[in-house]
Every structure is written in C-alpha cells, then in structure tokens.
C-alpha cells in the first residue's frame, strides 16, 4: 500500500533489504514481483541463500504466489581466486535447484565501494568510471533483459 501512492510515477521500485530474514525482508518479498539473491563469494554466504530460498518458498505459498527469482548475483567476487570459482560452481548448482540462474555479471571486491558507502553516495556518483560501476551497469542490463524478456 505504501508504494501505491507513487507507483504511477515509476516503472520499477527496488527494495534493498538487510541480509537478516526479518519482518522487513518478508514484507518486501510479499510486495515484490522479482527477487535478486545476492551472495558474497565466501564459504558461508551460500548458507544464507539456502535460508532465503526457504523463505521465498514460504512467501510463494502464503502471500505472493507470483514471486519470481531473477537470479543469484555474486558479490565481492574475484575470478582469480579458487574460493570464488568454488562458490560460483556451488551457486550454479543451487540456482539449478531453485530453477533460476547465476547472473553472468558479478560485482568485484573493490575499496571504492566502501569509500562510496562512507560518504553516502551511490557508486555511480562517487566513481562513475570505476570498474565496479561497470560491474553494476552490466548487472542492471542483464537483469532488465531477464525481467523484460
């Protein structure tokens, strides 16, 4: 209901929720059409994906049967490390179980992200020419292609 007043002014509303599966996240998933599952390229992050997948299934059962998973987005990713490669393989297996995909785009580990957060600016304002800004652009393009068909 909160978005209804402004819905006609926007094509999309992006709800960035905390990683904890609390009331805010459940409410956001209830209101959403699509969900992107972010996963850091570390050993424990995919455990969170499993928990979120269970929550998504419950949301589909009880409040939002049309909720779709757009894909899994790997973050803090470094393709040169063996752990990132292992996490990518595990994410691919998990995506197959969830009937979704791992995005071709990924977000690299970069100090500039922390700097932008510290000064409370989006990466596109703080460092629009950075490699990580390119990562986000590539991800947005891939996401929009998937959503819009």
Question: Can you name each region flagged by the protein language model?
Answer:
Residues 1:
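PAPS-dependent sulfation machinery
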Residues 4-108:
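Conserved catalytic-core segment of NTP-binding enzymes
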Residues 98, 103, 124, 138-139:
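Phenylalanine-focused residue identity feature
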Residues 109-115:
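Short, glycine-rich, amphipathic interfacial segments at transmembrane boundaries or analogous
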Residues 116-134:
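C-terminal boundary of histidine-terminating zinc-finger modules
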Residues 128-149:
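Histidine-centered active-site loop/cap adjacent to the catalytic His
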């Amino acid at each position: 209901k909160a978005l209804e007043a402004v819905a006609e002014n926007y094509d999309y509303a992006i709800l960035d929720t905390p990683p904890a599966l609390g009331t805010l996240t459940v409410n956001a998933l209830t209101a959403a059409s699509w969900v992107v599952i972010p996963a850091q390229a570390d050993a424990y992050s995919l455990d969170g994906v499993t928990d979120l997948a269970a929550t998504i299934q419950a949301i589909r059962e009880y409040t939002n049967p049309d909720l779709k998973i757009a894909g899994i987005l790997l973050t803090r990713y470094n393709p040169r490390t063996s752990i990132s490669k292992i996490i990518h393989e595990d994410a691919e297996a998990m995506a197959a179980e969830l009937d979704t995909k791992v995005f071709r785009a990924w977000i690299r580990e970069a100090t500039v992200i922390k700097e932008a957060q510290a000064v409370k600016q989006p990466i596109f304002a703080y460092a629009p020419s950075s490699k990580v800004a390119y990562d986000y652009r590539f991800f947005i393009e891939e996401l929009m292609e998937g959503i819009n068909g």
